Amino acid sequence: MVKKWSVSYPAVNGVEQRRVYVYLPTMYEADPERRYPVLYMFDGQNVFFDADATYGKSWGVADYLDYTDTPLIVAAVECNAGPNNERLVEYSPYRFDDPTYGHFDGKGQATMSWFIHRFKPFIDRNFRTLPDREHTFIGGSSMGGLMSLYALLQYNDTFSRAAALSPSIWVSPEKLSGLVGRAKLEPGTVLYMDYGSQEMGNHEGMRREFACLLYTSPSPRD
C-alpha cells in the first residue's frame, strides 16, 4: 500500500507543495504492534508509479517489496523538476560550476535539514517506525545518489545505511573527498554504491576512484 499526499517543502525559490509517498508493507495492518525500519528516498515521483515517473518508468519499489514480503516502510518526496535545473540546486550539498549548466548555489544542506528535522519526525509520529539510527536508511540515484552518500557521511548519527546508485560525484569530488576524510562513521555503517560501465564522460572512473577512497579510509569509530 502506498499513501500519497502533499507537504510544504523549502524549495529553491521559497516554499512549495510537494508530493510525499509512503509505502507500508503488506503485514502493516495485520499486526498493529509491529514496528518497521524506514528507507527514505529522493526523487519520490520515480519510486512507485509509472504514471508519476519523470520518464514514464518507475523503479517499481512497491511491487518488489510486496512480492518479497519485505518488512520495510519507504518514505519518498518528489524533487523539483523545473525547467531551469532546480533539481541540481536542491540535491547538491555544495556550490559548483559546470561548463554545461553554469553556476549553482547548492541547497542540499537545507534539503537534508528538512528531511532530518521535519520529514523524519513526521513519519515517526504518524507511522509505526523503528526511529533509531540502526533502522533508518536513505537512498537515491544520480543527484539523489549524491545526496544519499552525503547524508550517510555527514549525518551518520541519523542514517546507518545508504544506497547511492550512480551518484553524481562530479558535482564536487574534492569536497566529497574531504568529507570522507573527516567523517566519523559508526560501526556497522553500510554503503551500497554502483555505477554503469557505459555512463557519459569520466563518471565511471571518478566513481571507481571514490569507491577506492571510501574503502581505504580509516573512518569508522573505535
Q: Model-derived features: where do they sit?
A:
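Alpha/beta-hydrolase-fold catalytic nucleophile elbow
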Residues: 78, 165-166, 194
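Conserved small/polar residues in nucleotide/adenosyl-binding loops
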Residues: 215-222
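A domain-start/cap signature at the N-terminus of enzymes
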Residues: 1-37, 72
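Primarily recognizes the serine-hydrolase "nucleophile elbow" in alpha/beta-hydrolase
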Residues: 134-177
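Active-site machinery of serine-nucleophile hydrolases
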Residues: 50-104, 112
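The feature captures the conserved acid-bearing segment of alpha/beta-hydrolase catalytic domains
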Residues: 170-214
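Gly/Ser-rich "nucleophile elbow"/oxyanion-hole loop immediately N-terminal to the catalytic nucleophile
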Residues: 96-137
